[in-house]
């Protein structure tokens, strides 16, 4: 399948590359429709990451937060046109003690492994979640960062005492704002 990838080749320079994407029946092909730019993407683009990191990871398609529509699923679990969220972490092993996002063998999109700035993204079936039709796609593009906030709040719940009349969140970015919204909703 012919695919177009938009790769950052050096700070502030994105080049278009065309390649033949192998189509595996175990994968779902997703066409990204709404993407969210993370601070990590900005640091790669602006060249504010360490030069050694840039040299090691570029060229690379950016963006690890996004939703899209299914273009192809040979197994039929998803229909063409189904709205889905793409999970950027790709684990290759299971560990009873270490969460998949902390395993050294896992690959994370847009961190040394092409992200979602492509016309089509081949995703493992377990890395795709169908979205309800009622969810606004612009909001859904933030599901990955919302999951980060939710994970932090779940840990907070496990290790904090029961008195939660007042909770403070330090930070002035999207993650702090979303975490504050979720905390307010939960408590």
Where are these regions (language model features)?
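Extreme N-terminal starter segment of soluble prokaryotic enzymes
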Residues: 1-4
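Residue-level recognition of beta-strand termini and adjacent short loop/turns
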Residues: 9-10, 24
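Glycine-rich beta-strand-centered segment in the early N-terminal region that forms part
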Residues: 23-35, 50-93, 132-134
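Cysteine-cluster motifs in flexible loop/terminal segments that predominantly coordinate metals
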Residues: 38, 88-129
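Short Gly/aromatic-enriched secondary-structure transition segments
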Residues: 44-49
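Glycine/charged-rich beta-loop-alpha catalytic/anionic-binding loops adjacent to active sites
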Residues: 127-137
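Mid-domain Rossmann-like dinucleotide-binding core that forms the NAD(H)/NADP(H) cofactor-binding site
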Residues: 135-187
